[in-house]
């Protein structure tokens, strides 16, 4: 019988554990996580010793996460085994060690790394060792790390909100404007065309190299009554939404329009920057169109809302098609002069009255055909 792994002297330093040391960001919200354990599945990226790998998924659509370093190195570095970020501040360990001035040359060869990890493994299990060095660091450096961990991108508030209140006057509830950070929990400012390309230079023209204000597009024009009033066809229960940006998810549109009624389907095309909102009932579509009044803002993205128009695929009657054809001919004929129109009509009438003088030969096979079998020969 071959010897066990722990009985082998060369394998006695390999790590075996039943639970990983992972931060909350790497774990899903569900407290019941299914993990796959593989003993000695890979070598640690720091000490190069074989260790136990744990694999799991945050949800069904997420990628599979796994541990990258062994538990001993994770406890020595006070970091997560998966993302390798500091457990106290959530920062990279390189930034943390530079701020705490704990950067020291470690072992370079693989043998020395294994010896270093094995030497500190027993000390960590007893509650002493390199972990105590983090408690002896400077408090100012730890405060710097806290500010780095809680920092967010810079966002400048509007000037009227930064001005102090004069004469002790307080603003009413109607004048109060709440502006939250665009990177926080609340929604940010509404995106406009000026915020994307900057303020245009004053000048003439329709924009471009000469500067000036460009001509507004159809999405910037005010909505008309045809966009708000329901169409005459009672079978139309769809709304056509334009202005959909690439970062506006489909579930945000669904949660915004589902409050007016049950949705039959929602078709969103980020490539075409539009979406179709198909309601199950006509009353729900009318309520949504009445509430939006041709415009809507979803997660800071301005949208244009109008009624959907079905495309007629050759389902008109013959009389209706001939009527449209006559209207087209009449519209073209009214553009010319009256004399030229009269001459053209007269010439056409004379040509129609001329009888056909050319005899056309009948097609082959139209006459009586005589076969040899019919003659009896």
UniProtKB/Swiss-Prot annotation:
One example of a Gene Ontology biological process annotation: mRNA processing
Gene3D superfamilies, per database record: 3.30.70.330
Primary localization class, coarse: nucleus
Coiled coil ranges: none
Sequence ranges assigned to domain RRM in this UniProt record: 237-310
Compartment annotation: Nucleus
Region described as Disordered: spans on this chain: 155-232, 333-377
GO annotation, cellular component aspect: post-mRNA release spliceosomal complex; Prp19 complex; U2-type catalytic step 1 spliceosome; U2-type catalytic step 2 spliceosome
Keywords, comma-separated and alphabetical: mRNA processing, mRNA splicing, Nucleus, RNA-binding, Spliceosome
GO molecular function ontology, one term from the record: U6 snRNA binding
Function: Involved in pre-mRNA splicing. Facilitates the cooperative formation of U2/U6 helix II in association with stem II in the spliceosome. Binds to RNA.
Subunit organization: Associated with the spliceosome.
Family membership noted in the UniProt record: Belongs to the SLT11 family.
Protein name: Pre-mRNA-splicing factor slt11
